[in-house]
Every structure is written in structure tokens, then in C-alpha cells.
Amino acid sequence: MMRFPRFTMGGEIFIMEAPKNLNHQELLQKLDLVGCGAVVSFLGITRGHDHGVEIYRLEFDAWQDKLGNVLRLLAETAIESFGVSKVAMAHRTGPVKAGENIVSIHVASPHRKQAFQACEWLIDELKIQAPIWKKEVSEHGEKWKAGLG
């Protein structure tokens, strides 16, 4: 795990590396929620199927030297753009079986509207900007997917 001690405009950021077993509750507990009236969370899970094809697992490869920095910059931008107080994020790397957690994002804020907006923006931008690649292993074999979406 790595915690970036950076505080932005009163905001706290926590980024966790998650090569195995992403525990979203543990990630949420890293945030000090004093002064927050809302927490909005997103938990991405491997579906196990895609257009009728059984998916056994997804395999995520990441540019580890850059991943933490990209997630931190996304969190900083969310704090500054939406006025939220705290952000915690983690994304799995390696194999992730059907039904297992892939990504967890928690956004804490004095008010819910900003937390919802920031959380949605964070997952959308993570899928675009994070240096992570996804391989799908299914009943039809293996294939690299374009983007994380």
C-alpha cells in the first residue's frame, strides 16, 4: 500500500496498490470522514460474461511506476474541480476472477451532489487515463481489450 501524504485544498488522498484481493471496506476506512456529510463509492466487479460469452477472468497489466501518480493526479483534480474533501482509490492488477473486485473508489464530501459527480468523473477518467491494460480470458480463448471500458 502507498499513501500519498499530499493534501490539496483541504482534501485528503489515499491510493492503494491492490495486486490481490481488493477490500473496498478497508480502503474506505483509510479516510478520516470528520466533516463529511456524504460518501459515494464505486465498486467495479468482473461480470463473468460479455455478450453471452462466459468470461473466466480478466488479467490487468499496469505500468506500475506511473499508475500511482496517475491515480493521485485524478484524485487531486476531483478535489479541486468538484470541491470534495477526500478520495480513496485502488485498482487490481494481475488476474481477477468473475465476481471479484477490480476497482474501488470512495469520494467523501460535505454534500452528496459533489461526491456523486466526482465519483462518476473519477471512474470515467480512470478508464481513459490509467496506464492499465486488460486481457479477457473466456470460453473462446484470450484477447486484449481496447481500453478499460
Stretches found by the model and what they are:
Residues 2-101, 108-149:
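N-terminal, polar/charged subdomain of small-to-medium soluble alpha/beta proteins
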